């Protein structure tokens, strides 16, 4: 049972802020707060400054929707990338995993989420119209759906497949070497590289 002792308002605010992190409950948040305040004041100050700077200076890339300091991120601005390939992922973490596989040299679009009806997240919330406009720019020749192999990821991929295929785009999906129910963030780079090479038409 959580302690019922009264806590200072700044401590309560810190705990509530830490609870916003994924997978962090009230007990974990309280432990983090105690650790920072008791054992790592310098780290607490660094964390606060880093969060403030990130919120102030980061924005979404105008082309791929990932995080950047500039209007267009370094990946989208790289002339060595293949503009005919567009890989759609759920999160920047998934984008980083695909990049670490060294099996992809195209461009990306980051959804910043996935369709999750129970959470009130649908195509409108993910701004699918912007995704479609990006894919239909006249340069993209193939769209690779690299959403996670979870129920929500599959639903997202199915919706995008229908929307993009009816517009004449070639749409492919990562091969099933990625285990069902898994998230790309936790899949090894070798498996992702194989799944990219063996991707299948939808």
From Swiss-Prot:
Gene encoding the protein: recR
Domain Toprim: 84-179
GO MF annotations in UniProt: DNA binding; zinc ion binding
Any Pfam family matching the protein: RecR_C
Record function comment: May play a role in DNA repair. It seems to be involved in an RecBC-independent recombinational process of DNA repair. It may act with RecF and RecO.
Ranges annotated as C4-type zinc finger: 61-76
Gene3D superfamilies linked to this entry: 3.40.1360.10, RecR Domain 1 (1.10.8.420)
Organism listed in the record: Bordetella pertussis (strain Tohama I / ATCC BAA-589 / NCTC 13251)
Protein name, entry field: Recombination protein RecR
Family classification: Belongs to the RecR family.
BP GO terms, sorted: DNA recombination; DNA repair
Entries under PROSITE patterns matching the protein: TOPRIM (PS50880)
HAMAP family, alphabetized: RecR
PANTHER family recorded: RECOMBINATION PROTEIN RECR
Keywords per UniProt: DNA damage, DNA recombination, DNA repair, Metal-binding, Zinc, Zinc-finger
């Amino acid at each position: 049972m959580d302690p019922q002792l009264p806590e200072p308002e700044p401590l309560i605010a810190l705990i509530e802020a830490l609870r916003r992190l994924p997978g962090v409950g009230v007990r974990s948040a309280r432990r983090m707060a105690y650790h920072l305040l008791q054992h790592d004041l310098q780290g607490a100050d660094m964390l606060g400054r880093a969060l403030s700077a990130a919120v102030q200076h980061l924005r979404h890339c105008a082309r791929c929707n990932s995080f950047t300091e500039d209007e267009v991120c370094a990946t989208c601005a790289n002339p060595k990338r293949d503009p005919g390939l567009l890989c759609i992922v759920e999160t920047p973490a998934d984008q980083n995993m695909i990049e670490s596989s060294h099996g992809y040299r195209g461009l990306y679009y980051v959804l910043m989420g996935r369709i999750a009806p129970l959470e009130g997240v649908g195509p409108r919330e993910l701004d699918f119209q912007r995704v479609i406009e990006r894919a239909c720019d006249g340069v993209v020749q193939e769209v690779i759906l690299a959403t996670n192999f979870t129920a929500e990821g599959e639903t997202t991929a199915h919706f995008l497949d229908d929307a993009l295929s009816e517009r004449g785009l070639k749409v492919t999906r990562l091969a099933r070497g990625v285990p069902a129910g898994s998230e790309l963030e936790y899949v090894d780079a070798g498996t992702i590289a194989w799944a990219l090479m063996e991707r299948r038409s939808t």
